[in-house]
């Protein structure tokens, strides 16, 4: 850990300062900028990579601006001209399934949108939270979508229910929710754990919480001396790294298998990595080691064993809001065989208007606060078959 062949990977970074800053792809070995993609300013959790072939980024919506949001998509083998989508509402955090078939976006209003990537079809939109969405993450098996909001609420949604656009009488897709956090959720991290059934949330309330995703049970809370702004595990999921508002990065040994105490710290004092002068904005992990970004406009590559910075990158055009590690081969502009297909994402439809006979086919769910009790989650025997059939049908498009 902390030692590896970094030549096989490159680092994608972006800022939210202005559209001219764009996206940079850096060589982690030398610090050289390999590619610059113009016209991008993405908020926290607003950048992701689809199947190592496309970069997708939501765009910041400045105060006072008129109109909805924007989501741009770039093919990595021809990254200069983006595919531009303009939903009617600003989109902040993004999440995608591992196969790249489905994309979710969260809005400041608390709505979540679910698109099918291949043809851009909007599959579902619903009021997920009463406050602004801050994080979205799919479970390791893609059966569940997890969302976190500004008021500390964490929700778990059934993808099978969300994808069932024909059953308009079905109950809401919410499996369970929690308001255990007392401040904004800043990170959602799914882990392999036991049967892919655990995830970790971080918050400005100075805690990280481990959850059983099936039952919604809070397994354990880890307290910190200050607010946590970003989380990540190492590749083996043995260590949890939690970035703080003062630039510190706290390191804990993570063992989800020990349900009574999944967070463990070796020694009397927690390990703290110090190298930033501003709040941590993003964390990710590569074969070389931990990568951190901060409001001090620097990105650091760490050897976590020796607790030292291997390399420091300066991003003079603003604080980095997103870090994504991709294979080097994805950024070398090669023509991709059997390239995955993406389309312009459909605009969000207007609400149904009974006076003019317009009916929206999108099922809308109420926010978690409207539910008196969480819905019990039981995995059905048909779940795998439903997902499989959908993936087959989309792959044939």
Task: Please give the residue ranges for each predicted region.
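Terminal intrinsically disordered, low-complexity extensions flanking WD-repeat/beta-propeller proteins
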Residues: 268-272, 279, 305-397
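Intrinsically disordered, low-complexity acidic/Ser/Thr/Pro-rich linker and tail segments
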Residues: 1-35, 43-78, 344-355, 375-397
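A structural motif specific to WD40 beta-propellers
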Residues: 32-35, 80-83, 121-124, 165, ...
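Short loop/turn segments immediately following beta-strands, especially the blade-tip
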Residues: 158-167, 253-262
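Conserved strand-to-loop turn within each blade of WD40 beta-propeller repeats
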Residues: 16-19, 58-62, 66-67, 106-109, ...
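WD40/WD-repeat beta-propeller blade N-cap
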Residues: 38-44, 85-91, 127-133, 171, ...
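Loop/turn segments within WD40 beta-propeller blades
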Residues: 2-9, 48-53, 94-100, 130, ...
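WD40-repeat beta-propellers
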Residues: 23-26, 69-74, 112-115, 154-159, ...
């Amino acid at each position: 850990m902390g030692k590896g062949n970094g030549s096989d990977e490159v680092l994608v970074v972006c800022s939210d300062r202005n559209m001219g800053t764009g996206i940079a792809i850096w060589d982690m070995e030398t610090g050289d900028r390999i590619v610059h993609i113009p016209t991008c300013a993405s908020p926290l959790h607003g950048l992701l990579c689809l199947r190592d072939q496309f970069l997708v980024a939501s765009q910041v919506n400045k105060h006072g601006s008129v109109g909805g949001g924007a989501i741009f998509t770039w093919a990595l083998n021809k990254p200069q001209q983006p595919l531009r989508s303009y939903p009617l509402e600003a989109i902040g955090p993004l999440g995608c399934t591992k196969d790249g078939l489905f994309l979710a976006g969260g809005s400041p209003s608390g709505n979540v949108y679910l698109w099918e990537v291949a043809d851009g079809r909007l599959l579902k939109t619903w009021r997920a939270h009463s406050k602004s969405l801050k994080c979205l993450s799919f479970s390791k098996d893609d059966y569940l979508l997890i969302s976190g909001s500004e008021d500390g609420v964490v929700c778990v949604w059934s993808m099978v229910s969300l994808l069932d656009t024909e059953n308009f009488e079905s109950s809401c897709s919410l499996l369970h929710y929690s308001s255990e956090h007392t401040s904004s959720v800043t990170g959602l991290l799914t882990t392999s754990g036991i049967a892919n059934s655990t995830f970790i949330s971080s918050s400005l309330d100075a805690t990280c919480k481990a959850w059983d995703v099936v039952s919604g049970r809070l397994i354990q809370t880890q307290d910190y001396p200050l607010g946590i702004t970003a989380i990540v595990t190492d590749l083996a999921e043995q260590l949890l790294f939690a970035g703080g508002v003062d630039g510190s990065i706290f390191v804990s040994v993570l063992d989800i298998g020990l349900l009574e105490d999944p967070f463990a710290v070796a020694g009397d004092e927690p390990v703290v990595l110090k190298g930033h002068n501003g709040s941590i904005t993003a964390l990710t992990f590569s074969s070389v080691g931990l990568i951190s970004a901060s409001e001090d406009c620097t990105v650091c590559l760490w050897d976590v064993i020796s607790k030292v910075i291997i390399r420091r990158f300066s991003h003079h055009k603003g604080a980095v809001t997103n870090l994504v590690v991709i294979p080097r081969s994805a950024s070398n502009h090669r023509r991709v065989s059997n390239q995955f297909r993406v389309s312009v994402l459909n605009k969000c439809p207007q609400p149904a208007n009974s006076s003019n006979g317009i009916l929206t086919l999108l099922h809308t769910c109420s926010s978690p606060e409207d539910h008196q009790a969480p819905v019990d989650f039981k995995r059905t025997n048909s779940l795998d078959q439903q997902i499989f059939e959908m993936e087959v049908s989309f792959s044939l498009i």
